[in-house]
Design a protein with these regions (language model features):
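A short, conserved structural fragment
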Residues: 74-84
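Alpha-helix N-cap/helix-initiation sites
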Residues: 23-27, 45-46, 59, 63
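Short, cationic-aromatic polyanion-contact patches
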Residues: 84-94
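Long, compositionally biased intrinsically disordered regions
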Residues: 1-4, 44
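Short glycine/proline-centered loop/turn elements that form peptide/ligand docking sites
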Residues: 49-50, 67-68, 88
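Short acidic, hydrophobic short linear motifs in intrinsically disordered regions
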Residues: 43-57
Length: 94
């Protein structure tokens, strides 16, 4: 099988998994920010937005797009603020 065929199958598998957990309705920037957040979160699922911002998956994303996606993820309940003050700390909620 050609490499592009393998990649297509892998992408199809990822899409199926996203559908199972409800991520398919997120925009691509929202998904990328969510995945990067999951990758940089500590054992308690806590992360700082700057850690996410500098992850290779999203570091080339425009700042407004990144922060809009982050805000949307909070509004949708995927992330919650980990502090009562605005300090950039979030916790993965689902």
């Amino acid at each position: 099988m050609a490499e592009h065929g393998k990649l297509a199958r892998l992408r199809d598998l990822l899409w199926q998994m996203e559908v199972e957990v409800g991520l398919e309705r997120l925009s691509q920037p929202q998904r990328d920010v969510y995945y990067a957040a999951c990758l940089v979160a500590d054992a308690d699922k806590v992360l700082h937005s700057e850690q996410v911002r500098h992850h290779p998956m999203v570091e080339t994303m425009a700042r407004p797009t990144f922060y809009r996606a982050l805000k949307d993820l909070v509004q949708e309940g995927y992330l919650v603020s980990a502090s009562e003050i605005k300090n950039g700390r979030y916790k993965i909620a689902r």
